[in-house]
Amino acid sequence: MEVNDTSLHKGFGLDINSQRVFGAQAAISRNNYSKVNASINPSPPRSNDNSNKEFSYSKDVNNNGAVEELSLTQLFEVPSQAAFAKQSSQDISDDELIQHDSRKVISSPYSPKQTHTVLKRLYDRQSVISDHEKLLTPQNVSNSSQILSPFTSLLPSTLSTLKDTPLSVSQNEKNLETVGEVLVPETVAQHRTKFYDYTLDEMENETESGQVETTPTRLATSLGSPVLYGRVESTPPAFLPETSEKQYKRKFSFTEPSSEKVDNTETKFSKKTKNINDENFPNPFNVISSYETSASPSTVIDQSSQVSSIFVNKRLRKSVNNQAISRSDSLSLDTPKIDSLFTRASIKPLKPSQSPNSRRSFKNRVLAFFKGYPSFYYPATLVAPVHSAVTSSIMYKVQFDDATMSTVNSNQIKRFFLKKGDVVQSTRLGKIKHTVVKTFRSTNEQLSLIAVDALNNDMVILAHGEIEVTVPISTIYVAPVNIRRFQGRDLSFSTLKDMKFEETSFLPSHDSQRNRSSLKERDSSFVKKNLDSESNQLIFDDCVFAFSGPVHEDAYDRSALETVVQDHGGLVLDTGLRPLFNDPFKSKQKKLRHLKPQKRSKSWNQAFVVSDTFSRKVKYLEALAFNIPCVHPQFIKQCLKMNRVVDFSPYLLASGYSHRLDCTLSQRIEPFDTTDSLYDRLLARKGPLFGKKILFIIPEAKSWQKKIENTEQGQKALAHVYHALALGADVEIRPNVAHLECDLILTMDGNIVDETNCPVVDPEWIVECLISQSDIST
């Protein structure tokens, strides 16, 4: 074999002058080093003349002490199984190493500590080579095409299938499923320069420039020092490698941590950060945070915005916007504003002059009657006087301090200023009644509108007996019985002239942000369109509404309709129709009487339950029990269109489906006079079960308040009890069948043995009575 370029000697790691071959040092086993020199034919020594084109042979010493020559092909010869068997037969411990030298062979045992030192130096090369992969493949040199792609006839049989055959794995490695560690001669690690004719830096430069490459016949991995090529599997070292600072700077990522599966491509920003790291941070690892490269967070945002949009996300946008708001001039912060990619649209914070309260004066402060529960007179702000289309009288739209909007009559509102001797209550003092001593202003600073009264006072001194206490005037509320003594504080035309009112059309305060269907969007647009013309007409000022459902998800926009009803004077009951009646379970008695309406229901004339279709939901069944109309949402739209409360009969829904009759029944509403109050009509009504005595058997009735109310089954039982009371029956709750006079016995499962021969029914019987609106037992 002839080679025309002497650079091949350098590529193979051959020192021609010293006649040494460092590749011969690669004959390594797991336990020891054994020289495999069987069947090696000696060849004449190589001449020192560099003009000779034939490779020489390096000298070595055999077991008999004779000098032997190694041919070039022996460098690539894989040890046979016989050689491994010969090695394993030798009685040598695992801690013994055989040190190879080109002139002699010396066997010396090494301690585990020294073995660790050898391994440490091996990890300095950043790789571990298994014992069956100890051969070194030739480098890719331009003038060595025959070596890179050897013919079978030119190479030994062990290399004839090297390109297409995977490397063999010993049986021990298959069992252990790991790659064995390699123990290298200490002389290689200590005297590295003796085996190379150029320094490590030169080798790195050639590798980086592409002059030294791996052979395409093997899966090669480039190593640091020395540069070895072969099929290598490595594990992370348990100690810190002794590597130069330059190598760490070259191998660490400076922008973001990434896994091995992600392509860590450097951008302009990362290269810029890398240069900054090299100059200002000479630590061994040179890993810094991006926040240390700039003086302020705004600089970091500006730099990242110039690189790529991948750094932009919703959370970052939101944080930047919040920073811009906090740095606005209105908050008097010295921090400079952020002027970056994310703040192109100027953010205009709400100024004090633009707040809704600024359009009103403290003279607008009133005490208004709250139609919900509990019903007292609370501090509120008068929004505007409105005209009622039903009563043709002036009403007042007010906003309570908790932002609740309501509409009250002229006899349900008073100017909010207190006089000495007024009997009031405070939310900070419980239900105890106190007498007003005096009111005063505690500070000269500008206070919120909800913190003062109509005289711009913010504190009040109250007395209870001989004890006086000072509380904020915004915590005051007055019972309807005591409001009659508030003489001289009615609203008049002269007092209204001094007040400031908003020029508003009372549109819905907000649009629904939930995803609506096209049907819901048409509902909202229709409602808003019909509000623009005569929006000040409170057509629902004497109406109460309860919304059930929708049963179908996209049936109607419930939120928009609730807002429209409230803005037109109506009251929306979120919990159903129960607030209109007394609480039957408040008495804590087992014998319950039929329901009676509360007197506050005198404020309304009509009540409606709105749903898209009939159902067996609680609010819907309550409406059937109280004989209150259940209407379609189209009823509200028609009222807005006609600007008055229209006849509800065309919009009535069915009562429900009767399993007993196997059909759907219509809702039958008794005719009534709309001028009568809701209280009078409910009080005069008698349900279909009026006069009936029902015994409700509940096993936990002995402690029904603790057990029944706190369980799902118990709440269902109480709902059926409430429906029976709404139908006019008297109900008694017992844990078992007692010898009591009753018309029928109601149980949750309907299975009970009764000796009194009373009919036993289940809750479905109550539901059938509600749907049919009659007593089905007769």
From Swiss-Prot:
Knockout mutant characteristics: Not resistant to the microtubule depolymerizing drug thiabendazole (TBZ). DNA damage sensitive in response to ionizing radiation (IR), ultraviolet (UV), hydroxyurea (HU) and camptothecin (CPT).
Main location: nucleus
Effect of residue 619 to E: Disrupts gamma-H2A binding, but has no effect on dimer formation
GO BP annotation list: DNA damage checkpoint signaling; mitotic DNA damage checkpoint signaling; mitotic DNA replication checkpoint signaling; mitotic G2 DNA damage checkpoint signaling; negative regulation of DNA replication; regulation of double-strand break repair via homologous recombination
Result when mutating residue 215 to A: Reduces hyper-phosphorylation in response to DNA damage. Abolishes formation of radiation-induced crb2 foci at DSB sites. Impairs checkpoint response after DNA damage
Positions of the UniProt region annotated as Interaction with dimethylated histone H4: 370-404
Phosphothreonine modified-residue sites: 73, 187, 215, 235
GO MF terms held by the record: chromatin-protein adaptor activity; histone binding; identical protein binding; methylated histone binding
GO cellular component assignments: chromatin; nucleus; site of double-strand break
Nucleus keyword on record: yes
SUPFAM superfamilies per UniProt: BRCT domain
Outcome reported for the amino acid change (mutating residue 235 to A): Abolishes formation of radiation-induced crb2 foci at DSB sites. Impairs checkpoint response after DNA damage
Free-text comment about domains: The Tudor-like region mediates binding to H4K20me2.
PANTHER family: TP53-BINDING PROTEIN 1, TUMOR SUPPRESSOR P53-BINDING PROTEIN 1
Complex formation: Homodimer. Dimerization is mediated via the BRCT domain. Interacts (via BRCT domain) with rad3. Interacts with rad4 (via BRCT1,2 domains); a single rad4 molecule interacts simultaneously with both Thr-187 phosphorylation sites in a crb2 dimer. Interacts (via Tudor domain) with histone H4K20me2. Interacts (via BRCT dmain) with histone H2AS128ph (gamma-H2A). Interacts with chk1. Interacts with sad1.
Role noted for this protein: Essential for cell cycle arrest at the G1 and G2 stages following DNA damage by X-, and UV-irradiation, or inactivation of DNA ligase. Plays a role in the response to DNA damage. Interaction with rad4 via its phosphorylation sites in the N-terminus couples the DNA checkpoint apparatus to chromatin via interaction of its C-terminal BRCT domains with epigenetic modifications on histones H4 and H2A, respectively, in the G1/S phase of the cell cycle, and facilitates recruitment of the checkpoint kinase chk1.
Protein name: DNA repair protein crb2
Biological source species: Schizosaccharomyces pombe (strain 972 / ATCC 24843) (Fission yeast)
